[in-house]
Amino acid sequence: MAAKTYNAGVKEYRQTYWTPEYTPKDTDLLACFKVTPQPGVAREEVAAAVAAESSTGTWTTVWTDLLTDLDYYKGRAYRIEDVPGDDTCFYAFVAYPIDLFEEGSIVNVLTSLVGNVFGFKALRALRLEDVRFPIAYVMTCGGPPHGIQVERDIMNKYGRPLLGCTIKPKLGLSAKNYGRAVYECLRGGLDFTKDDENVNSQPFMRWKQRFDFVQEATEKAQRETGERKGHYLNVTAPTPEEMYKRAEYAKEIGAPIIMHDYLTGGFCANTGLANWCRDNGMLLHIHRAMHAVLDRNPHHGIHFRVLTKCLRLSGGDHLHSGTVVGKLEGDRDATLGWIDIMRDDFIKEDRSRGIMFDQDFGSMPGVMPVASGGIHVWHMPALVTIFGDDSVLQFGGGTLGHPWGNAAGAAANRVALEACVEARNKGVAVEKEGKSILTEAATHSPELKIAMETWKEIKFEFDTVDKLDVAHK
């Protein structure tokens, strides 16, 4: 073995971290970055800089490099690709040895991949487009507390998507009035109701009073309908200790499901709560508040497909996924891609959906995607087609905005859903024939008829900001 020597000074990153001859190992963690360099900076140099600054490198050589096997531990920029339709940036593919990351710690992975490197001056912008977690690393993560099949067994609901509703107005209701709205929605035919992401424990409605009134409403609706019901009680709190206190109380009063804002709450808190839910038989609903700050800019940040993978590994039984057809951002093909990431055991590379790597989740349970945001009964045929059975279709204003009240809004959604599922099971092209399916169903449901009349002109026809790269469409 050749003796190591130390040569002080600064050398180009590409001398150490640009390795186009490298063949990634099955155990490597692979990352695809969309890199927008400063003018005049060579692609190979800036790709190598990303690999260096997200792994072992710093701005100068250091003598302590001699005390380790730097060639083993370093990140390696091994491939560069053009971004179709955009000559201001390029894709840089980086391989990291698995030993760089603490087992089961999404916190540690993100600290490296999206840490200081995102402030590097040689970059105008940087976006983490996708990550391939090796199966050896996946197996160190807890994943969803229960998964889709266990949830169906707990809730005793099969053969269709689940129906939910976010209680509105999201802020300002007293606990008793909040519970009343929950009861009316569940009695009307929904499976779940939900706290909104910013409902925690404010002066107008403290968490414990909300939990009590909501659970009373849930149990009353269960008795009257003979169906299992639930409400996502948001336990997101200022401290982990307070979060667990709220979770314990939810369990004590008999709630089947709690909720966490995983990005604002953080991955450390989320992984801990997922572990607690697994141990205590509680389902865990995950809201993605703050995601658009990270993922909406097509040149800088973290793509939602990465945040989806991280959540599946960290733990959650539900995750908000966008709707494609509602009021929130969401390219159809990209959304189908991260729905697959949530639910499937193995996801093949598919550039048409923005998926840059194969991803193997082994036997890890799937996460149920939640379609929520500006949807109503006219969207039901498209939602059933896009999301399939293993999903939650969540209508907030599309339930509570019904002219006849909350229970009627819930009934309209339930009738619309069951009509679409029945038609699909008969082989009808539901999305194509949606209008006729709903019109026929409305002949025996005045609630649905009024809902269709109320929202027939409501559309959210804005262009998607974060589109898939054009040549992959």
Curated annotation (Swiss-Prot):
Catalytic activity: 2 (2R)-3-phosphoglycerate + 2 H(+) = D-ribulose 1,5-bisphosphate + CO2 + H2O; D-ribulose 1,5-bisphosphate + O2 = 2-phosphoglycolate + (2R)-3-phosphoglycerate + 2 H(+)
UniProt-annotated catalytic positions: K168, H287
Single GO biological process annotation from the record: reductive pentose-phosphate cycle
Keyword Ubl conjugation belongs to the record: no
Domain of life: Bacteria
UniProt-annotated binding residues for Mg(2+): K194, D196, E197
Comment on bound cofactor: Binds 1 Mg(2+) ion per subunit.
Annotated EC: 4.1.1.39
Assembly behavior: Heterohexadecamer of 8 large chains and 8 small chains.
HAMAP family assigned: RuBisCO_L_type1
Listed name of the protein: Ribulose bisphosphate carboxylase large chain
Gene: cbbL
